[in-house]
Regions:
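Active-site rim helix/loop that mediates acceptor-substrate recognition in acyltransferases
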Residues: 58-79
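An amphipathic alpha-helix signature
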Residues: 39-43, 65
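Short, contiguous pre-domain boundary segments
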Residues: 19-27
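Acyl-donor (CoA/ACP) binding surface of acyl/acetyltransferases
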Residues: 1-6, 10, 21, 38-39, ...
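A short glycine-rich, hydrophobically flanked beta-strand micro-motif that places a catalytic Asp/Glu
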Residues: 78-81, 151-153
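A short beta-loop-alpha structural element at the N-terminal edge
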Residues: 29-40
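Helix-loop element at the rim of GNAT/NAT acetyltransferase active sites that forms part
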Residues: 44-58
């Protein structure tokens, strides 16, 4: 399959979701993770018991920093902080699922996009906000890479809340897969759900 030049499927900067067009309760945007600026915030979020239950990263600050540095250095994944009206409220890992170790565990297609989502503050959870943001960001991923036909998610299979959220965002629960660290629900959103 030919590569598209001049397109970085992981670059979703300069995009905005607004109440008028996207049903978001404010203006939402993504910015690259800045370790100096964001480490304390991400450490707090990762250590929130509700987040830690599924992210499994209730770690000391230094270990979170090491994990985030690895994300920044990845050649197939980009970490972002999501902001609502310029206030940080979410963490995103947007990646090429076909280039990720995950591809060994499902029938990967060339240019599959992948998404990991963490809503930080407890008051950002619920209210359907996660579904709206996941719908918007996954559409941005497909828009950014014309060769991508779908976005993949693989939350813990016991995370029923996120699986319901993903369904509201246009994802289908295709099957469960056994990963080395968890049993995951394989979720897929194709272009046909845009």
């Amino acid at each position: 399959m030919p590569e598209v030049t001049g397109v970085d499927p992981l670059d979703l900067l300069h995009r905005r979701a607004t109440p008028e067009h996207d049903g978001i309760p404010g203006t939402f945007s993504l910015r690259p993770l800045d370790l100096d600026r964001d480490l304390d915030l991400l450490h707090t979020w990762m250590n929130d018991p509700e987040v830690a239950r599924y992210w499994n990263k209730a770690w000391p600050r230094e270990q979170i920093a090491s994990y985030l540095r690895e994300q920044q250095l990845s050649t197939h994944s980009t970490p972002y902080v999501g902001e609502l009206d310029d206030v940080p409220m979410s963490y995103w890992e947007l990646y090429r699922a076909d280039l990720d170790p995950l591809a060994q565990y499902y029938d990967a297609r060339e240019h599959d996009a992948g998404v990991h989502l963490l809503l930080g503050p407890a008051d950002s959870r619920g209210r359907r906000l996660a579904a709206d943001l996941l719908r918007v960001v996954s559409a941005w991923q497909l828009d950014a890479d014309p060769l991508a036909t779908r976005v993949i998610g693989e939350p813990d299979a016991t995370n029923e809340r996120l699986i319901r959220v993903a369904a509201l965002a246009g994802f289908r629960h295709v099957t469960d897969i056994e990963l080395p660290h968890k049993r995951a629900a394989l979720l897929v959103r194709g272009r046909d759900s845009l």
